[in-house]
């Protein structure tokens, strides 16, 4: 069997992954009847339901909706569950290039191997965490572009309760290592408050909010003040998680723009640019920056002085520019405000009350440690296709000569402080340097060919498929 090898690495502190994902699958839905009342289950089925027999999700009467629970099929990898241990981006690229041709496409058995069970099952996740150097993790659902569009308030509340109960049960496999961020039914603010108190009693530390204006429900409106008060009282962090604005479940005739990233998607589409992932360069940051500027300059954090927030999956390099601009424009126009004056500069509020996520290949934060000292929290984004392990983040930090004290803060300490979570009694110190792989694993020559730009468009030279070697490709030199 081929062996994928990695250079030895070590760390002397526990890590905390502030934003990793589970994939909502049949395992999530099969607990609905046990965790919901009869009335809640009825409301759920009328609004959103997953049929385990057909593998189809129905949302607001629309069949085959949503992006979670994708079936494992030959010739495709699941982008929501592929980034398990050692699944580096060049390997994913090589397999995607294989899938361009029927003759080289992966089989269903091979696709199942790449569909990492940790995205659905906690025992498998804990094993993967040991390899990936992840000591503690905050799990977040995947299908956050679907849920804000559920039309019925009771149905949305039932969905959130169903997911949150399943996520809590998932965490019980090792409650010192796995934590969950709760979904909240913003369609009905009163239900969102009740659900927040309920999950807080279960030890939940984060309430998730998608910063979009779905059905006129942008999460800064006065009708949500009760929710922010509840977050203050419970200490639950306002978890702001953006996403590309597909908007596939917008009601017929709904023409309002619901997200800044919707404009980005339309711009690329009208320009004839075919690759959907090109929008990711701007989508996440656009939703996050619009929310942050609005929250800071509207005085949200001054009206709720014990409210704390975390920005997820938006990178962090843009933040220094945005905070500088917020300070500059507040100074310029504060005498023209029709709102109450702020008690301190927007940047000062952010540094006191917020943290921002970053992923391991994002280099600028490690070069600007004074700015990010207390606000930076690492995210793996595992098991999504762009996810990676703590060792990748450490490589980036080592190149910037970042001190070990700051490595410890960025990779765990800041997140635990923000969430008020204690460090684990034990933690992973040394990297796993070898992973046994199946015979069909991509060879290095195949990866080299796949990484050429033309490989995604033109037929590449025929690589050798399934040729085992003593060392599997895709490790690190």
Map each language-model feature to its residues.
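Mid-to-C-terminal alpha-helical segments outside catalytic/metal-binding sites
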Residues: 2-14, 25-136, 165-173, 194-198, ...
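Short, hydrophobic/glycine-enriched beta-strand segments
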Residues: 15-19
